[in-house]
Amino acid sequence: MTMMDTDEGKTVMCLLTDPEGTHLGSAMYIPQKAGPLQLTQLVNRFLDNEEMLPYSFYVSDEELLVPVGTYLEKNKVSVEKVLTIVYQQQAVFRIRPVNRCSQTIAGHAEAVLCVSFSPDGKQLASGSGDTTVRLWDLYTETPLFTCKGHKNWVLTVAWSPDGKHLVSGSKSGEICCWNPKKGELEGSPLTGHKKWITGISWEPVHLSSPCRRFVTSSKDGDARIWDITLKKSIICLSGHTLAVTCVKWGGDGIIYTGSQDCTIKMWETTQGKLIRELKGHGHWINSLALSTEYVLRTGAFDHTGRQYPPNEEKQKALERYNKTKGDSPERLVSGSDDFTMFLWEPSVSKQPKKRLTGHQQLVNHVYFSPDGKWIASASFDKSVRLWNGITGQFVTVFRGHVGPVYQVSWSADSRLLLSGSKDSTLKIWEIRTKKLKQDLPGHADEVFAVDWSPDGEKVVSGGKDRVLKLWKG
């Protein structure tokens, strides 16, 4: 780093880059007293933004919250090289941290195994060991419908990204499609899988609107594509030699499946042909996540809550997808029983971009932040780890849970992370300070499932004590 004295005091040679590493102009001298505000003005000027947009700045994955000179002194940075500062556009809205339980809702007769907010954040679905799916009214925080149709535990629920359908999968292998406005079964349960359903993922709305197709993964070793209008399985994706544990339908139209056979397979969706295999894990794959997952889940719905007519929905969803994805390829992260994770750019290479090590026990759940900048991982080693979502570099470890961590979820602005654990608590972690923001005790037993509403207003949790808890800021 070169420093020199000028009329306005000391300056530093800096290079501004976006999170993908694209330079914003060439290296330049900036005053040492410049902090985030001055850098924000500089970036807005360079990008010719019509209005001032908010940015955050990072040096070596640490957020720059002080003037550059103060950072140099504190970190004793060598004065021989250029300082690289990464700029990242912030969400223009802020999510309040939740800090209190607003409602405890009884209703399920057995453990709550899965929970999911609708893409617009207005409705909530839960699945239970009592074989029912329940829909809840978030305004009154009371039960809306009890959906009966399964004969066994409901292991997973998934909303279509246009919010018009809800699909659930059970331990017996059948799939139920529900009309969430009425709580009624749309036709008979769909059969085809021989063993329990491990995951459900919808075709993104920017590829097909209105939503019709979804994919399921099962312990029977297959994944199946279903058409909700035809009410049947249209393609069976066969090739894994053991249980398929997770599935994601990517924004480029490719389906990813993770399996106990230690491989990830990529499928095209017109005929169900295998495109590529991603290998590297030494044990079962438990979880897959995509860098674009939040926009795939929410489709045309954004934080403003605006509703779009069906003919505009596809275009709006595509705009949101392209904005999140940027110029870089969609990224995939996998978490495994071998204690490790891999970061992939599957459209570019079948070799992993990075191996993410550090967990001392199996990795149960992995999840990208809505802006794609971070990856969070939950493990049986009682910790949550945070990684750079672009490079895969380790950032920090969140310790505080005293039991295995089952699931994580992000706030819509990517500033807060939620975790649920066997220790009966939820915890909210702040990404900026890398510290615990809020401890949320209240459940009487293990917390199996958590979700943060896409509009950021509420958190839901469910588990062994059979109740749903809603949390607010």
Curated annotation (Swiss-Prot):
Its main location: nucleus. Disruption phenotype: Female semisterility due to strongly delayed development of female gametophyte. GO terms for cellular component: Cul4-RING E3 ubiquitin ligase complex; nucleolus. InterPro entries: G-protein_beta_WD-40_rep, Gprotein_B, NLE, WD40/YVTN_repeat-like_dom_sf, WD40_repeat_CS, WD40_repeat_dom_sf, WD40_rpt. Constitutively and ubiquitously expressed. Required for female gametophyte development. Associates with the pre-60S ribosomal particle. This is Notchless protein homolog. The lineage of its organism: Eukaryota, Viridiplantae, Streptophyta, Embryophyta, Tracheophyta.
